Amino acid sequence: MLQTPPDLPPVAEPVAEQVVEAVAPVPAPSPTIAVPGLDDSSLYIHRELSQLQFNIRVLEQALDENYPLLERLKFLLIFSSNLDEFFEIRVAGLKKQINFAREQAGADGLQPHQALARISELVHIEVERQYAILNDVLLPELEKHQIRFIRRRYWTPKLKTWVRRYFRDEIAPIITPIGLDPTHPFPLLVNKSLNFIVELEGVDAFGRDSGLAIIPAPRLLPRVIRVPEEVGGPGANYVFLSSMIHAHADDLFQGMKVKGCYQFRLTRNADLALDSEEVDDLARALRGELFSRRYGDAVRLEVADTCPKHLSDYLLKQFSLSESELYQVNGPVNLTRLFSITGLDSHPELQYTPFTPAIPKLLANADNIFSVISKQDILLMHPFESFTPVVDLLRQAAKDPHVLAVRQTLYRSGANSEIVDALVDAARNGKEVTAVIELRARFDEESNLQMASRLQAAGAVVIYGVVGFKTHAKMMLILRREQGEIVRYAHLGTGNYHAGNARLYTDYSLLTSDDALTEDVGKLFSQLIGMGKTLRMKKLLHAPFTLKKGMLDMIARETQFALEGKPAHIIAKFNSLTDAKVIKALYKASQSGVKIDLVVRGMCCLRPGIPGVSHNIQVRSIIGRFLEHTRVFYFLNGGEEQIYLSSADWMERNLDKRVETCFPVEGKKLLLRVKKELEGYLTDNTHAWTLQPDGRYVRSTPTGNQNPRSVQATLLERLSNPVLNVR
């Protein structure tokens, strides 16, 4: 039976379609209604609880039959992956506050121990629900398409023979069982690794009879093993590694009786404790921290739901965890390893229809990309439009004899990065290449260290950003000599220089040679690479200096327009809203009559729809095929509309503790284009969720005679080139 979380309705309730009108504020409430002050904790949603709500929306997609079946499975696995990181970072951070007696309530008023209690309650419900969806919905549906995960009770004699041989040849030689006794203490287990606790009976060759053993499963072993068709029958048949180990645990303890074998998985604190202000060599210090991350403090224990209480209690004691941190699951404890089967070539009908990102006509046949950009700005929206022009710009720069220098920020670039390849080529071809690499990009630290070493070996100058501030800005600057003068070309984006993400995330890219904007980009690079006072910018807003103030000023300007009785409208789209100062500014704007439409994919600590405070604010979240990642800010500005694109969300960490960029969209054509694309998010009635005043999200559905509208499908149709039956 599928359980419904307490903060979600049993069935998605239809929400009336929103019509985009710049001048339709909700009337102010009656003066008799008590209006809370803007510091009142009831006006704010706890950050971590809001993040959990986002993950619940992701899980809901696994039940949506409008998605192809393997994509629904993928959403369920993304839920697991997100939850892993949530415990590794967010839960670990709350526990750390408690352990160091540094409990401090946020704007919402919740103390860390109170938040942890609510998190535990909600996650227990959602994890049980997740496995129910897997076992009762997705696996039976997959079996109809001849994709099977064969449990032990359904093994045929032929399959048992094949499994025994596979276990003997491929698994047993690699596994190292550890018996527990005074000379064999409980092993130090790697974060998120698959392990088994085994209860034994009997005495071994040395007379030992401790009764317990641990089997760590090496990460090099696949978690799902495909069975040959001649053994398992037609279709794609799989056996879990855990099932193989359960079935043959006796073989690992010769002469002893296995009373029980149960899988478990430990999640540890994975946040790096490195303080960049207290180290002399950041790269060297980071390498040491990366190893210790695998063995941080325990924050969660997952065990098979068949595991007896005395064994789960034993494990909890070993890891100094409480019972509220124990999660019993009906299936594999490491679901993220199932990602390997979601791209089956044999079942394209169970996956999204492939598409080819478009290349604008201006660039499609251009021999010289610099000549195109010199005439006009080029705006790309990924993944509907290709990331290739960004790579091509850098490739041409690497080979162009007129290019003098290239400067580039890198936060996440992925393996086998074409961007990094082009930077290496540029350096080898004698260009002055400077790369500002953020070594502390979470979970990409090791990759970025390797990237830095490769660029240094090619002759590039590598800078590790600014001490105390992560460099999250996405910018490239190319200096080229033209007719005796140095001309600047720049790329600014809302997303990373990561070709893989550019096929999965929605992001904007701006290619420009605008004198003022490229000069600003050059100034920001100078600040990052050298030292000196903050430089005055002409067009660019940049954190941690002018971006937050600039956003607050623009919100205040709309507020003033509303107070003067003029139309006032803000549309903002980004990933997360947690900054209390920004939220208060939005509340004040709403109270003054500004119509505010927010499209916030993830965390949102603002409560919309509260009479007298946020009655003019609507918050939507779009969850669909592509991960929404664009940061777009629209201001009506008394009819002189302004739109900014940014690398930053409205979060304290982005606005106060990171190097970020925010740049204007200029020219009537581009301005109208981005506005139209932004408005599409306000009328989506298939993938939109609307935030309620009580913190719930309600899914939008077409009502009456409305046609289904998906903003992602519309953009895909309008901007890209669909390719059928091609992978």
UniProtKB/Swiss-Prot annotation:
GO biological-process terms attached to the record: polyphosphate biosynthetic process
Claim: tRNA processing is one of the keywords in the record: no
GO molecular function, one term: polyphosphate kinase activity
Residue positions of the active site: 472 (phosphohistidine intermediate)
Catalytic reactions of this protein: [phosphate](n) + ATP = [phosphate](n+1) + ADP
PTM comment, free text: An intermediate of this reaction is the autophosphorylated ppk in which a phosphate is covalently linked to a histidine residue through a N-P bond.
Residues the entry annotates as binding Mg(2+): 412, 442
Residue numbers binding ATP: 82, 505, 601, 629
Keywords in alphabetical order: ATP-binding, Kinase, Magnesium, Metal-binding, Nucleotide-binding, Phosphoprotein, Transferase
UniProt entry tagged with the keyword rRNA-binding: no
InterPro entries per UniProt: PP_kinase (IPR003414), PP_kinase_C_1 (IPR041108), PP_kinase_middle (IPR024953), PP_kinase_middle_dom_sf (IPR036830), PPK_C_dom2 (IPR025200), PPK_N_dom (IPR025198), PPK_N_dom_sf (IPR036832)
GO annotations of cellular component type: polyphosphate kinase complex
Needed cofactors: Mg(2+)
Enzyme Commission code(s) on record: 2.7.4.1
Purpose: Catalyzes the reversible transfer of the terminal phosphate of ATP to form a long-chain polyphosphate (polyP).
HAMAP family: Polyphosphate_kinase
NCBIfam families the record matches: poly_P_kin (TIGR03705), PRK05443.1-1 (NF003917), PRK05443.1-2 (NF003918), PRK05443.2-2 (NF003921)
Family (UniProt): Belongs to the polyphosphate kinase 1 (PPK1) family.
Protein name (record): Polyphosphate kinase
Organism: Pseudomonas putida (strain ATCC 47054 / DSM 6125 / CFBP 8728 / NCIMB 11950 / KT2440)
